[in-house]
């Protein structure tokens, strides 16, 4: 029956929080208004005085512990204890547990019947047998009573009635005593074999087995407010249980104290139930009091029955597999309970009823040891309770409680069979007299319960024996109790029109015939449903609304402000693939993950892709659904594909088939066997640079000075001295490019920042995303050029890293500082709008030079040549005539547009420039300059005032020194000799083009941008301006080279890990700050790889047909040259100044991440071969322990180097607070991983590994498994020893 509270909005705040915890506690406590429990308490006080007061207190504390654990299980797991037991144990075990719970309920109902019968006897003076019949017949009234309560909000009304009855009960017992005597000599414990029977009866009266299952079920029906965390709700339940059971103990103490004073001190013998009730004689003297007493018992009986009706049905269905109506359940229990009551009345009379009341409590106590094992095991199971697993202290208390129950039971059984105490003699005497029922029942109950206890003790939970099959992850705020839905989206198209709106605009996603769907099984938390979201795009400014999902959250955010001058309907095709698979909750591997990703803001295609990992079980093993993504480029008929590794299928649009693919049965934790082997090899290769197999620094690392992890290295310092306010020139050529890359943040670095308009030609060169990963120091950010060619609005602009001020109107059509290949579509669309498709095609075939002075008239189309260029890392295979050893660095980005003004002079120099120009494009590592002609041609037509300045120059204000620049280059260019820019000229030494010779004095022999984030210390970037007072002088302190090499090696290692099949699992764990930082670094590298792949494929697709065969061949090589992309990407290390995470501390965090991941894999690994590989890696990583855990470390905050567009955030990635700043860490994940955390994980790994066994009689089972376990156990012991000594320091 579904229950509910009254409207919570009308209740005070205290009641709204207290009722969900008080309700289940009160409904459970009403079962203690039971004559059987009174009889046990009074019997203990009458026979042993105050000796049993302290044991009764201990029993009460054990009851509080058991009920709290039961409630905690219900709150945390969202399932009741019976359901979990049915999942964790086999059918027969569950059946025996169900029988025990049913016996406990029948015993409670039996005592209730006897109590009601006694009340009717006292009230009306009828025969006791008749009263038992009448008490049994009241079960007929139960359906009416239950129906009435169902109509009147059963939970709330039942709770109120239970609370009222408990108050009456407590008040009646307390006022019946003229005074409450307290023993002044303490509460002595004098236990003996004679008190074993009384102890067992008190234990059964304090703890009832069926309440464990009932309480966890009632908790689910009394859900609290959604804004209360599980931890707070568990605490509320604890205090509610503590208060209620404290009141119960107070009543029992009063009864025992009174019995001790009345019977024990006077030597009277208590034989009948009326004698026990004589303790409350002051109350029973009034007929009204007797009537109230009978009504209390009557309603308590029905409330108990209703409680069982609400929660006990789960016990019958989960354990006994019985699905019967509620009224039939009630009638069955009542009939079974009436039979022994009538038998006792007919054979033994009033004395027999009293003995039967105590007998039922003893029988319940015999069931306790076997009943608490599932409760304690589940509450302490990490697989079931996850983070809410009980503490070690509570586990110890649970163990002591169990041992105490078992000890009392053993003493009782031994005394009952072999002892000579009075109660044992009476039982055996009744047997010899022919009445063997009670003795036989107790003996059978004890033996069967003991056997079940042994079976449960030897049978682990299923989740503990299948660590690699099931891990239950419940969210902190929401409980997942229904079957999980695995969603793979179906394809539909949506049409979206952009219009000019402010922040208050609303996002509208409309599809053909249907609106955007909302998934019913995804809980929207911490999101304002009224928050307006605007998705707008224009020709010049492209902003993409962030659509994020993180666990159970769906958050929509939009850019703060939009600036548009031209708006036109832009139809975007949004592909959403969806297919639904229902996976039962017992097979769920983890919480459902839905990734909603969007393409880059420059593209006009948004892909919303679902990324799901759900586990499916079959007869042979586990298989995983792969992640698929399909992304397209507008204007291209072919989809983006890549021939790279299959693990990047979500990046490049291709999913590999075969190997450890979707159909592989060798999947483990998201990684196939081959991927796990490659993971271990990659990590072993990386850490092998630093440490040997003993965790000691290698000699090679010392020689190369790579052992720098213990030194706090700082990035290089840059001092910027601005002596003048105006500049007639700026950094030119390569020097200018380098400075520009530091001043201008690339799209790859910050894709969604506001574009900055200016007339700086060099800033719009062909620099690509990864090449902008050099150090961007904050001091250089403010050294922003101001010249006559800049507008007033632009000159007042300041830059802070990748955050720019708003664009001015005159620079509206200028593209961002970094032009990626995948921006070509946006540029072409702009041209098409102004000129039409035919004009566009003509321009693409033969673009005319903008200015005759910028280059020869027969130069080759840069777009045509760039389409077929091949990415190179190192010397080019083909070199231009007259150039020797043409070495191109990825970081010294030589834009294609530079050839229009570098060395084109008259005469032989002009002729040499023609041939050299043609070959240059094939050896350039950068293709981004291909967009230059079209952009500037477009700008020249849109802005007439730029006719003389727009082109492929490299200065801020070319009008200031353009003439001297060209005269300088022309004068030094000879027909066959070395060009003048091979030397640093006095006037404009920085205005050199690219000429690479084997001359040791050549500028290009040093590869200046291979340094760590900044230029070589021998380079003075401002030297091209001479010694003028208004120049910028940079004092550069070269960083330690080993640090840069180490960080570059780290980047390569991350890229290799990302290429592993199923690598998403590695970077989707919710761990500490170190792991979170590495996950962010990986997300950044993943995004860069995605950008590179899209760019390469876009160029290859666009340039396939209209160009030369040699270009097509080069383009195909480029598309397949994945290794070249990787090497180019990691040829530098980003650095954004002070606070940047790219320092040696990042390597320490990576070491912690590696230890954590290897231990996670070892926890589920069952192959000795991979155990050995993990052992190698763990041996090397011993060197990290001292650095990571010897002293407390503060977590590094994410910097701008880790910024990625929110549209590319994966579901498990940390949420982005806004479009500019890096995402903040999640609450609770801001602490570094401690040694204690790893120690707990190591203990789990040891337990898991010890259970792995191979097939006996085989080489694997007899040799590989024992040897692998021995080696892995050895290194784990060393880790435990080292981490134990570092535990205090790391906390």
From Swiss-Prot:
Sugar attachment sites: 227, 550, 891, 1027
Keyword field: Cytoplasm, Endoplasmic reticulum, Glycoprotein, Membrane, Nucleus, Phosphoprotein, Transmembrane, Transmembrane helix
GO cellular component terms given for this protein: endoplasmic reticulum membrane; nucleus; plasma membrane
Motif (Nuclear localization signal): 1262-1269
An example molecular function term from Gene Ontology annotations: manganese ion transmembrane transporter activity
GO biological processes: ethylene-activated signaling pathway; iron ion transmembrane transport; manganese ion transport
Sites bearing Phosphothreonine, chain numbering: 818
Organism: Populus trichocarpa
Membrane-traversing stretches: 18-38, 48-68, 96-116, 128-148, 155-175, 195-215, 231-251, 253-273, 288-308, 335-355, 356-376, 393-413, 441-461
Protein name as catalogued: Ethylene-insensitive protein 2.2
Family: Belongs to the NRAMP (TC 2.A.55) family.
Function summary: Central factor in signaling pathways regulated by ethylene (ET) and involved in various processes including development, plant defense, senescence, nucleotide sugar flux, and tropisms.
Record comment regarding domains: The N-terminal (1-562) region seems to be regulated by upstream components of the ET signal transduction pathway, and may in turn regulate the C-terminal region. The C-terminal (454-1291) region regulates downstream events of ET and jasmonate signaling pathways, and can confer constitutive responses to ET. The nuclear localization signal (1276-1283) is required for interaction with ETR1.
Region span, Disordered: 498-518, 614-662, 742-768, 787-808, 836-856, 1210-1229
Composition skew (Acidic residues), residue ranges: 617-627
Amino acid composition bias (Polar residues), ranges on this chain: 635-653, 759-768
InterPro entries assigned: EIN2, NRAMP_fam
PTM-bearing positions, type Phosphoserine: 647, 664, 923
Pfam families cross-referenced by the UniProt entry: Nramp (PF01566)
Primary gene name: EIN2.2
């Amino acid at each position: 029956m579904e229950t509910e509270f009254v409207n919570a909005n009308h209740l005070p705040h205290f009641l709204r929080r207290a009722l969900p915890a008080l309700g289940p506690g009160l409904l459970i406590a009403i079962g203690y208004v039971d004559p059987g429990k009174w009889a046990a308490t009074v019997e203990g006080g009458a026979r042993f005085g105050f000796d049993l007061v302290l044991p009764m207190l201990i029993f009460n504390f054990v009851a509080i512990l058991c009920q709290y654990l039961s409630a905690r299980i219900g709150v945390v797991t969202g399932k009741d204890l019976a359901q979990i037991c049915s999942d964790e144990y086999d059918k027969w075990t569950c059946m025996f547990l169900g029988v025990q719970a049913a016996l406990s309920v029948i015993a409670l109902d039996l005592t209730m019947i006897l109590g009601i019968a006694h009340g009717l006897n006292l009230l009306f003076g009828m025969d006791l047998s008749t009263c038992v019949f009448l008490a049994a017949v009241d079960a007929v009234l139960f359906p009416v009573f239950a129906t009435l309560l169902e109509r009147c909000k059963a939970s709330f009304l039942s709770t109120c009635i239970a609370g009222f009855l408990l108050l009456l009960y407590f008040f009646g017992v307390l006022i019946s005593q003229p005074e409450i005597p307290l023993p002044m000599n303490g509460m002595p414990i004098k236990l003996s074999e004679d008190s074993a029977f009384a102890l067992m009866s008190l234990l059964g009266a304090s703890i009832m087995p069926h309440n464990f299952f009932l309480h966890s079920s009632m908790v689910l029906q009394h859900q609290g407010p959604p804004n209360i965390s599980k931890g707070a709700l568990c605490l509320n339940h604890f205090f509610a249980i503590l208060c209620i059971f404290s009141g119960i103990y107070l009543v029992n103490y009063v009864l025992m104290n009174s019995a001790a004073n009345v019977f024990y001190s006077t030597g009277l013998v208590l034989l009948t139930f009326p004698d026990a009730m004589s303790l409350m004689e002051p109350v029973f003297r009034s007929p009204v009091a007797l009537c109230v007493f009978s009504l209390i018992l009557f309603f308590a009986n029905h409330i108990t029955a209703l409680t069982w009706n609400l929660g006990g049905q789960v016990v019958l269905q989960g354990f006994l597999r019985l699905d019967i109506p509620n009224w039939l359940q009630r009638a069955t229990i009542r009939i079974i309970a009436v039979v022994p009551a009538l038998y006792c009345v007919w054979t033994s009379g009033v004395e027999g009823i009293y003995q039967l009341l105590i007998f039922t409590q003893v029988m319940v106590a015999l069931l306790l040891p076997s009943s608490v094992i599932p409760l304690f095991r589940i509450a302490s199971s990490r697989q079931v309770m996850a983070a809410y697993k009980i503490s070690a202290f509570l586990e110890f208390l649970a163990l002591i409680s169990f041992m105490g129950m078992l000890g009392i039971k053993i003493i009782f059984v031994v005394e009952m069979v072999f002892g000579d105490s009075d109660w044992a003699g009476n039982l055996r005497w009744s047997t010899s007299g022919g009445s063997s029922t009670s003795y036989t029942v107790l003996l059978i109950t004890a033996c069967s319960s003991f056997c079940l206890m042994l079976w449960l003790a030897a049978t682990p939970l299923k989740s503990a024996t299948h660590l690699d099959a099931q891990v239950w992850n419940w969210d902190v705020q929401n409980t997942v109790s229904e079957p999980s839905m695995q969603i793979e989206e179906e394809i539909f198209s949506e049409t979206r029109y952009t219009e000019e709106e402010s922040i208050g605009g609303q996002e509208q996603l409309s599809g053909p015939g249907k609106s955007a769907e909302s998934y019913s099984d995804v809980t929207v938390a911490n999101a304002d449903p009224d928050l307006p979201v605007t998705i707008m795009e224009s020709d010049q400014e492209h902003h993409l609304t962030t659509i994020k999902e993180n666990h159970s959250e769906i958050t929509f955010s939009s850019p703060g402000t939009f600036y548009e001058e031209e708006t036109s309907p832009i139809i975007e095709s949004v592909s959403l693939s969806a297919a639904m698979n229902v996976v039962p909750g017992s097979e769920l591997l983890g919480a459902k993950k839905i990734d909603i990703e969007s393409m880059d803001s420059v593209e006009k295609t948004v892909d919303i892709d679902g990324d799901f990992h759900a586990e499916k079980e079959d007869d042979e093993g586990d298989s995983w659904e792969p992640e698929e993504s399909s992304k397209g480029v507008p204007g291209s008929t072919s989809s983006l594909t890549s021939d790279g590794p299959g693990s990047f299928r979500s990046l490049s649009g291709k999913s590999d088939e075969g190997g450890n693919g979707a159909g592989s049965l060798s999947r483990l934790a998201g990684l196939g066997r081959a991927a796990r082997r490659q993971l271990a090899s990659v990590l072993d290769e990386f850490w092998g640079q630093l440490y040997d197999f003993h965790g000691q620094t290698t000699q090679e690392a010392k020689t190369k000075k790579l052992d720098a992890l213990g030194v706090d290295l700082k990035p290089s310092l840059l001092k910027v001295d601005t002596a003048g306010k105006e500049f007639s020139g700026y950094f030119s050529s390569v020097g200018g490019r380098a400075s520009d890359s530091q001043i201008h943040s690339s799209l790859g670095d910050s894709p969604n920042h506001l574009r900055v308009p200016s007339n700086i030609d060099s800033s719009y060169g062909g620099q690509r995303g990864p090449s902008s990963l050099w150090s961007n120091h904050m001091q250089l950010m403010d050294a922003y050029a101001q010249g006559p060619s800049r507008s007033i609005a632009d000159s007042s602009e300041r830059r802070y890293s990748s955050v720019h001020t708003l664009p001015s109107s005159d620079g509206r059509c200028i593209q961002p500082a970094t032009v990626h290949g995948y921006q070509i579509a946006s540029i072409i669309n702009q041209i098409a709008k102004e000129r039409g498709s035919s004009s566009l095609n003509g321009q693409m075939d033969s673009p005319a030079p903008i200015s005759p002075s910028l280059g020869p008239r027969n130069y080759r189309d840069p777009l045509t040549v760039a389409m077929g260029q091949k990415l190179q890392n190192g010397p080019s295979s083909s070199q231009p005539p007259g150039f020797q050893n043409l070495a191109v660095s990825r970081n010294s980005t030589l834009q294609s547009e530079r050839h229009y003004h570098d060395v084109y002079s008259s005469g032989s120099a002009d002729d040499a420039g023609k041939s050299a120009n043609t070959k240059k494009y094939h050896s350039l590592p950068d293709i981004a300059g291909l967009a230059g002609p079209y952009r500037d041609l477009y700008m020249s037509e849109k802005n007439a005032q730029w006719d003389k300045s727009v082109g492929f120059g490299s200065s801020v204000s070319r009008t200031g020194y353009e003439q001297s620049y060209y005269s300088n280059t022309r004068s030094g260019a000879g027909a066959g000799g070395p060009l003048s820019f091979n030397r640093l000229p006095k006037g404009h030494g920085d205005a050199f083009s690219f000429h690479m010779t084997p001359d040791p004095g050549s500028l290009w022999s040093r590869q200046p941008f291979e340094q760590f984030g900044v230029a070589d210390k021998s380079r003075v970037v401002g030297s091209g301006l001479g010694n003028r007072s208004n120049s910028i002088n940079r004092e550069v302190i070269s960083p330690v080279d080993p640090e840069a090499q180490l960080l570059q090696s780290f980047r390569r290692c991350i890229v290799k890990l990302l290429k592993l099949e199923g690598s998403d699992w590695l970077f989707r764990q919710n761990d500490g700050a170190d792991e979170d930082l590495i996950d962010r670094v990986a997300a950044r590298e993943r995004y860069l790889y995605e950008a590179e792949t899209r760019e390469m494929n876009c160029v290859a697709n666009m340039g396939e047909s209209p160009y030369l065969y040699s270009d097509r061949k080069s383009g195909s090589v480029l598309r397949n040259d994945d290794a070249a992309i990787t090497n180019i990407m990691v040829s530098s290390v980003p650095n954004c100044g002070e606070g940047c995470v790219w320092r040696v501390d990042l390597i320490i965090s990576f070491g912690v991440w590696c230890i954590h991941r290897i231990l996670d894999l070892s926890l589920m690994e069952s192959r000795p071969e991979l155990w050995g590989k993990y052992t190698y890696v763990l041996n090397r990583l011993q060197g990290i322990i001292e650095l990571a855990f010897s002293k407390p470390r503060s977590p590094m905050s994410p910097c701008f180097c880790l910024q990625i567009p929110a549209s590319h955030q994966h579901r498990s990635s940390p949420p982005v607070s806004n479009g500019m700043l890096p995402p903040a860490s999640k609450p609770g994940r801001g602490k570094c991983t401690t040694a204690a955390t790893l120690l707990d994980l190591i203990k789990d790994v040891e337990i898991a590994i010890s259970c792995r066994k191979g097939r006996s009689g085989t080489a694997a089972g007899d040799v590989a498994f024992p040897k692998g376990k021995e080696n892995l156990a050895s290194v784990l012991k060393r880790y435990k020893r080292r981490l134990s000594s570092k535990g205090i320091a790391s906390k």
